[in-house]
Amino acid sequence: MNDTYLSRFWGSDYQVILNVADIGRSLPPFWVDIATADQSRRLEAFRALVRQVFIHMPETSSLLLERTTDAYLVKVRDDVALVADRQADDQVLSYRGFAPTDKSMFGGSVGAFYKALDGFCDFHSMGGLLPEREIRPIGKDGNEYWTEPSSKLFETVKSKDYFHIFNSGGKGQGYISLHSTVVDDPEGLLLWVDDDEPMTNMDFWDLFDNWTSIAMEDN
C-alpha cells in the first residue's frame, strides 16, 4: 500500500478498508470484493473490476492487469476511493477513482463507466479521467487558452455542450460533448495551452485510452 501518497494527499484523515463491515455504504459487488486483508484476493477482485469497467479502454486495461501490484479501498471522510498501485523503478505510483453514484450526467458507455467508477486519475499529476464532482463546462473549468490555434477554436466551442473531463497532467486538456454521450457516440476534444494543433471530433474512448496508457507507460 502506498502510504506515502495516501498521507501526502489525505493527511491522517483516511482509513484503508480491509473488511466489508467497515465500508459503511452501499457499493457495487465488484467493489465490495476488494475490501479484504488478503492481498491476492484484492488483486483478483481488482482484475475482475478492470475487465468489466475498462472494456472501452483496452490499452489501459492491459497495463492495469499486467502492472498493478496492489489495489485497495480507502475511506476518506464520507467517501470511498479505490487505489491501484504499481511499481515504477524504485517508487510506487498510484491511480485513484471514487465510489460511483447512482446517477451520472453522461449517457451511454461514458455514463456506464461513471456509474461503476467515478473517475480514474494519477495521484501525483492528477492526470486522467476526472471524477464527476470536478467536471465543469468548457469556459468554466479554470483552463485558459491564449495561444492559437486552440484559442481560436475555444471561442468557437465555448458556447457548446463540451465538458472538461480529462486532465493530461500537462499542457493538454480533454473535453467531451455531453449530447454525444446520450446517443452513445462519445466525441472527444483536446485543447492545448501552447501552439500544438487541437484534436477535434475524436473518438472519446480511443483518444483517452491512448493518453492514459501513454502516461502509465512513461511512468
Name each model feature, range by range:
Residues 155-160, 166-219:
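A recognition module on extended beta-rich or small alphabeta surfaces enriched in W/G with H and D/E
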Residues 1-172:
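A surface-exposed partner-binding patch
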